[in-house]
């Protein structure tokens, strides 16, 4: 695990003590009050840093949505680039950083993150900037959300195997499905999307 700054350690201790005393996590304002500051922006930045380092998880839309991670169970996975949730886009495989998750969320080894670009999967609640947790596997079942390579370009879509073709279906009516007729194009499954992570502002 990455080392914490003095302020991050203080925030983590405040959360831990509050959980031990009250049985539920503190709000941003309660943390700010303990830190002796008036606003919550600084608290949010500390929580974001603690989440990136694998010490806690936050639940979007909840005033008390903080869960501490078991430090012995945390693991950091690489963010290996960008995948387009829209038109086909060349795959980018430069590691841009790492993101920590609990080991219990991994079904197998080799998993990695891709950052989502585009809006073709918005009805599946996948939006630009999300981190897609990808489990490498060479095949998929119907309705799986996958990262697929079509003629060397990557896309994130819902997978359907039909009689003589593969259909990669967007979850946005503004986009057309990608149809791969048998034998006409080279297509491969990079992996199945098994989780979506969104970093709160």
From Swiss-Prot:
Source superkingdom: Bacteria
Record text on subunit structure and interactions: Homodimer.
EC identifiers of the protein: 3.4.21.88
Location of the active site: 120, 157
DNA-binding region: 28-48
Record function comment: Represses a number of genes involved in the response to DNA damage (SOS response), including recA and lexA. In the presence of single-stranded DNA, RecA interacts with LexA causing an autocatalytic cleavage which disrupts the DNA-binding part of LexA, leading to derepression of the SOS regulon and eventually DNA repair.
Pfam families listed in its UniProt record: LexA_DNA_bind (PF01726), Peptidase_S24 (PF00717)
Keywords from the named record: Autocatalytic cleavage, DNA damage, DNA repair, DNA replication, DNA-binding, Hydrolase, Repressor, SOS response, Transcription, Transcription regulation
Record's keyword annotation contains Flavoprotein: no
Matches recorded under InterPro entries: LexA (IPR006200), LexA-like (IPR039418), LexA/Signal_pep-like_sf (IPR036286), LexA_DNA-bd_dom (IPR006199), LexA_repressor (IPR050077), Peptidase_S24_LexA (IPR006197), Peptidase_S24_S26A/B/C (IPR015927), WH-like_DNA-bd_sf (IPR036388)
Family to which this protein belongs: Belongs to the peptidase S24 family.
Residue numbers marked as site, Cleavage: 85-86
Record field: catalytic activity: Hydrolysis of Ala-|-Gly bond in repressor LexA
Record-given protein name: LexA repressor
Any single GO BP term: proteolysis
Gene name tied to this protein: lexA
A GO MF label: DNA binding
Tagged with keyword Transport: no
């Amino acid at each position: 695990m990455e080392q914490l700054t003095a302020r991050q350690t203080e925030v983590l201790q405040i959360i831990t003590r509050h959980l031990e005393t009250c049985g539920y996590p503190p709000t941003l304002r309660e943390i700010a009050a303990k830190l002796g500051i008036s606003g919550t922006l600084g608290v949010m930045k500390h929580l974001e840093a603690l989440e990136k380092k694998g010490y806690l998880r936050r639940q979007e839309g909840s005033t008390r949505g903080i869960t501490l991670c078991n430090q012995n169970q945390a693991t950091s996975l690489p963010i290996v680039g960008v995948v387009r949730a829209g038109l086909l886009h060349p795959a980018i495989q430069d590691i841009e950083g790492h993101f920590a998750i609990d080991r219990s969320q991994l079904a197998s080894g080799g998993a990695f993150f891709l950052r989502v670009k585009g809006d073709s999967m918005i009805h599946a609640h996948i939006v630009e900037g999300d981190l897609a947790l990808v489990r490498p596997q060479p095949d998929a079942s119907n309705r799986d959300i996958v990262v697929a390579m079509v003629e060397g370009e990557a896309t994130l879509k819902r997978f359907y195997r039909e009689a003589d073709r593969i259909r990669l279906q967007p979850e946005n009516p503004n986009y057309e499905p990608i149809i791969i007729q048998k034998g006409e194009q080279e297509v491969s499954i990079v992996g199945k999307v098994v989780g979506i992570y969104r970093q709160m502002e």
